[in-house]
């Protein structure tokens, strides 16, 4: 006897690629950007003509014209099966920090520069996206970080990051002093411009610019990258993703320190504060066109050499 699975309701969707069609699609983009608006208009028309219910993030909906259902990111997360982010990696990061708490897939259309997280071309997305919407896609889960600032033992601020959490001096560049602990075991003290704690996703971003190694996305690891350390022996270190990173700021530092999450959210840090960075329970479900190859992306985006023979 055959089993009849009802996939008509969005509630029944799975975190793996078992459902062949999406139902409700959310569009998210970079506000006040002409190229992004053009792509969003094409996407909205194309998806609507195919019978999908389409919701548009409220910051860009007003720029697309009338008869657009405008909602916030939380409603997109709650109602949609798929979110399409049009823009660069920064736009993807901003959306991902909100959408990771929901069970929906996220795919990107690149309207930025490198676009490590945005797979689809803006001028010819139809063919690849049609296959994705018909169930031909690869699913990849990326874990997030949770950063917390404690003062006198009390939690003062927290947020999540897809790429990295960075302890730095704030608006004025200067050396800061802090201690670093891994799972409550003292590792070292630092005199540096700051510290980057990065996920594998973020290893091709700020951490790479600071001399860190590239971690493949499937690794369950974190990389700690000191920023301009005042020593010749301090190098980036990779630790298990289950590790808890604690940074204790010296009381002798100035008062304008910050922890930045993906460069978007800034948490104020005072001398003597403790910063805890650990893996979040939230995961981003990235959707890629079938056959996505991470090393092809690296080779293309970073200008690596092609095959010799």
Curated annotation (Swiss-Prot):
SUPFAM superfamilies per UniProt: NAD kinase/diacylglycerol kinase-like (SSF111331)
Main location as per UniProt: cytoplasm
The keyword Secreted is annotated on this UniProt entry: no
Keywords associated with the record: ATP-binding, Cytoplasm, Kinase, NAD, NADP, Nucleotide-binding, Transferase
One Gene Ontology molecular-function label: ATP binding
Enzyme class (EC, first level): transferase
Enzyme Commission no: 2.7.1.23
The family this protein is said to belong to: Belongs to the NAD kinase family.
Name recorded for this polypeptide: NAD kinase
Organism: Shewanella baltica (strain OS185)
The gene coding this protein: nadK
């Amino acid at each position: 006897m055959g089993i009849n699975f009802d996939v008509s309701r969005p509630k029944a969707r799975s975190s793996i690629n078992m459902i062949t069609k999406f139902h409700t699609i959310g569009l998210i983009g970079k506000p006040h950007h002409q190229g992004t608006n053009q792509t969003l208009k094409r996407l909205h028309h194309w998806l609507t003509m195919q019978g999908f219910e389409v919701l548009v993030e409220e910051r860009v909906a007003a720029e697309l014209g009338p008869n657009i259902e405008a909602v916030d990111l939380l409603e997109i997360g709650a109602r949609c099966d798929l979110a399409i982010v049009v823009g660069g990696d920064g736009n993807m990061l901003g959306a991902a920090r909100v959408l990771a708490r929901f069970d929906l897939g996220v795919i990107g259309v690149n309207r930025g520069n490198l676009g490590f997280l945005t797979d689809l071309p803006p001028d010819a997305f139809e063919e690849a996206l049609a296959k994705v919407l018909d169930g031909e896609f690869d699913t990849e889960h990326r874990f997030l970080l949770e950063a917390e600032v404690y003062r006198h033992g009390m939690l003062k601020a927290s947020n999540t990051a897809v790429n990295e959490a960075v302890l730095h001096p704030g608006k004025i560049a200067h050396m800061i002093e802090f201690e670093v602990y891994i799972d409550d075991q003292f590792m070292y003290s630092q005199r540096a411009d700051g510290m980057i704690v990065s996920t594998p996703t973020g290893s091709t971003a700020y951490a790479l610019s600071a001399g860190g190694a590239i971690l493949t996305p499937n690794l369950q690891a974190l990389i700690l990258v000191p920023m301009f350390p005042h020593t010749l022996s301090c190098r980036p270190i990779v630790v298990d993703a289950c590790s808890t990173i604690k940074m204790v700021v010296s009381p002798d530092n100035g008062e304008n320190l910050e922890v930045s999450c993906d460069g978007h959210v800034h948490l104020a840090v005072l001398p003597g504060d403790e910063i805890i960075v650990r893996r979040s329970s939230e995961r981003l479900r990235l959707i890629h066109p079938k056959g996505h190859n991470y090393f092809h992306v690296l080779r293309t985006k970073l200008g690596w050499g092609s095959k010799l023979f």
